[in-house]
UniProtKB/Swiss-Prot annotation:
Subunit structure: Has multiple subunits with at least A(3), B(3), C, D, E, F, H, I and proteolipid K(x).
NCBIfam families linked: PRK03963.1
Native source organism of the sequence: Pyrococcus furiosus (strain ATCC 43587 / DSM 3638 / JCM 8422 / Vc1)
One Gene Ontology MF term: ATP binding
Entry-linked HAMAP family: ATP_synth_E_arch
Role noted for this protein: Component of the A-type ATP synthase that produces ATP from ADP in the presence of a proton gradient across the membrane.
GO CC annotations, alphabetized: plasma membrane; proton-transporting two-sector ATPase complex, catalytic domain
Gene Ontology biological-process entries: proton motive force-driven plasma membrane ATP synthesis
Database matches in Pfam families: vATP-synt_E (PF01991)
Family, per entry: Belongs to the V-ATPase E subunit family.
Cell compartment(s), UniProt: Cell membrane
Name of the protein: A-type ATP synthase subunit E
Amino acid sequence: MNGAQVIIQEINREAEQKIKYILDEARKEAEKIKEEARKRGESRAEWILRKAKTQAELEKQRIIATARLEVRRKKLSLQEEYISRVLKEVTSRLSNLSEDEYLETVLALLKEALKELDVKEIRVHSNEKTLALISSRIEEIRRELGDVSIEIGSPIQTIGGVIVETKDGNMRVDNTFEARMARLESELRSKIAEILFG
């Protein structure tokens, strides 16, 4: 049984107890009035009992509605907490890829940017670690990318990935991990929520 069901059951139990108490008090009051009003008729007692039942039902509905809102709020809070954890874990894993895995990722990001920019001369910006990796394996990267001139740009603050721009700086593609995560965040959140919460 999950936490939300436990909360709903507890609130339903409390609501039933409160309703029972209200009805018991109403019955006692009705019996008292019936005794006093036998000569005058029982219509007032019945009216009080009907009113008490109506009040009890309204109270029950109010308690249940409040409980449902609370359960929904807690579920959304829990969902957001789990989604944040997963996104942090993804970010952590991306920043801890092995050199070969990371180079493969950088190549894919460079290819994607080249396709979008449709140029043969680019400048690449990233963190110092990534720029050093690109510099040390530049020939391998050029073979993979084809006839492309690659200039190493200035270092930027990022956990990984690259910003690729034309030599004149007029066009750029931000393929840093942060930018890609931001672009995909709503889709990622939707998928993570579906996996975690069905």
